[in-house]
């Protein structure tokens, strides 16, 4: 039987270990800080110019995307993007086969616009995909009907509709279009958002978790970042976010491969 001081020592050790476990596994889920959602992002600081990202395949630049926010006087906010991608560099990707088979040269372009209410809910969005300089080959439109997001995919010879429940304030974006800021992160925080893939004509739920911290090199300088693990179905990707919420680098599954978006 332990002595009195041994019992005190064991109890103190147990209390310290329990406190560390609660801090690691419980507190991140109970903190009242805002989740990374449209409400938090639309209220964050808006940069005066769009953010430009390089699209990299094994460190080879194959395109770019610009993202930005517009805050309107009536309280609405718009998250917009414009993407240009060289499809020649991606021959063999099933997602682009229908565009490459047309023989149109030049860059593949995609524009998107997500309109957020003053309450931080996505109200509607528009996505257009252009092969080269032609008219849009694919149009995607989404409109919130109460708590149901009604999405339509329209292309030559194709008409497809999809409905799903929209979680209030939750994020939604387009494949290869990164969210440029994720404020109020902490290790252990989890959330979900949806990604629209107009080329595959699908929407996908992405599950995210801040798994730890890591020092990365960005603009030839070391930066302490949060590491966000993102699950796209069976595929896994990562995102590196500065402590102030700025996203520096993000992996994006594209077909069966992974591209990297680098904040310029």
Question: Where is each model-derived feature located?
Answer:
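Acidic, serine/threonine-rich low-complexity disordered tracts
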Residues: 1-147, 155-164, 178-264
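Acidic, glycine-centered active-site loop in nucleotide-sugar glycosyltransferases
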Residues: 151
């Amino acid at each position: 039987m332990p002595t009195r001081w041994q019992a005190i020592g064991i109890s103190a050790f147990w209390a310290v270990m329990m406190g560390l476990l609660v801090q690691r596994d419980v507190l991140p889920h109970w903190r009242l800080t805002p989740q990374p959602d449209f409400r938090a992002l639309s209220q964050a600081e808006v940069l005066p110019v769009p953010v430009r990202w390089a699209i990299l395949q094994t460190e080879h630049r194959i395109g770019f995307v610009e993202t930005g926010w517009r805050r309107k006087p009536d309280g609405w906010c718009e998250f917009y993007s414009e993407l240009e991608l060289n499809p020649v560099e991606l021959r063999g990707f099933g997602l682009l086969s229908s565009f490459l088979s047309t023989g149109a040269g030049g860059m593949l372009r995609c524009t998107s616009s997500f309109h957020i209410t003053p309450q931080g809910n996505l109200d509607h969005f528009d996505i257009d995909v252009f092969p080269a300089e032609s008219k849009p080959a694919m149009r995607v439109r989404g409109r919130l009907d109460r708590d149901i997001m009604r999405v339509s995919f329209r292309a030559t010879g194709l008409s497809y509709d999809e409905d799903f429940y929209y979680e209030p304030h939750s994020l939604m974006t387009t494949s290869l279009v990164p969210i440029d800021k994720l404020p109020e992160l902490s290790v252990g925080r989890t959330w979900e958002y949806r990604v629209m893939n107009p080329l595959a004509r699908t929407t996908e739920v992405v599950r995210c978790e801040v798994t730890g911290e890591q020092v990365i090199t960005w603009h030839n300088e070391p930066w302490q970042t949060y590491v966000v693990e993102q699950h796209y179905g069976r595929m896994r990707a990562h995102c590196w976010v500065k402590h102030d919420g700025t996203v520096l680098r993000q992996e994006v599954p594209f077909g069966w491969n992974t591209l990297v978006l680098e904040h310029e």
